[in-house]
């Protein structure tokens, strides 16, 4: 029997994981509810409200699906068939892809918002909400098509033990792919990661440069209105910068743990670390956004 199937005996790992999932679901639910109430009350929406609300919804759904899959990892039973396995795993991977796409587009959108009127990026401010929505849809469809191989390779775990199967949960396993298919899939996945994370790095570098210029200009002119404007822009941008940095670090850590898991297929420790690391960003990000919302902070302080 694969050693990963014994994870249900590790109570500390189980409790830690479900605590992480519970905190993440609570945070994303609160953030999503805040944006829904804000919309129905007629508050003027900011350009970043749509992607932030969408990101909280994606993370909420992803964590809920992860909680369902986790019951098949940490609770000793095997009751899922091929259809349930394919649906849950494909849905989960698609939501992870949506999270990456939306995070990347949020970084680009903040860079557009921060751009002065004289810059070429400022031309996209009026249509940025529409353009970002179209970009997210396009990238999401593209990623879901890349992950479509899971509809074939994910299967219910056979009764006979086979070392070639990669453990997903007690009921579900990943069929080994041919060298050609694995190479194609890995190449497409790497291209997607490089492209989207590259957008984050470029937009982040652009925002850092603009913030530095704003600060220098404010110091030279000693203007109150400019200082206040720069301060407001700094708060919004620093939140995005912090999330982008955190996301990139977690992506790198995730890749390292994933590679170590591939090298040591029967190591339950690497698998437990992997499933914990995969959800850190989705758990932490809503609280970062909540901490920057003045209305929420004032209510909590009051």
Swiss-Prot record:
Glycosites: 159
Localization: Cell membrane
Lineage: superkingdom: Eukaryota
Gene Ontology biological process: response to pheromone; sensory perception of chemical stimulus
Stretches of the chain found on the membrane's Extracellular side: 1-16, 71-91, 153-193, 260-269
Annotated keywords: Cell membrane, Disulfide bond, G-protein coupled receptor, Glycoprotein, Membrane, Pheromone response, Receptor, Transducer, Transmembrane, Transmembrane helix
Coiled-coil ranges from the UniProt annotation: none
Transmembrane feature ranges: 17-37, 50-70, 92-114, 132-152, 194-214, 239-259, 270-290
Reported consequences of knocking out the gene: Mice lacking all but one V1ra and V1rb gene (12% of the V1r repertoire) show a lack of chemosensory response to a subset of known pheromonal ligands and changes in maternal aggression as well as male reproductive behavior.
GO CC annotations on file: plasma membrane
Main localization (coarse): membrane
Cytoplasmic side: 38-49, 115-131, 215-238, 291-302
GO MF annotations in UniProt: pheromone receptor activity
Topological type in the membrane: Multi-pass membrane protein
InterPro entries assigned: GPCR_Rhodpsn_7TM, Vmron_rcpt_1
Cystine residue pairs: 85-172
Keyword Glycoprotein: yes
Pfam families reported in the protein's UniProt record: V1R (PF03402)
Family according to the record: Belongs to the G-protein coupled receptor 1 family.
PANTHER family linked to this entry: VOMERONASAL TYPE-1 RECEPTOR
Functional note: Putative pheromone receptor implicated in the regulation of social and reproductive behavior.
Name of protein: Vomeronasal type-1 receptor 48
Species annotation: Mus musculus
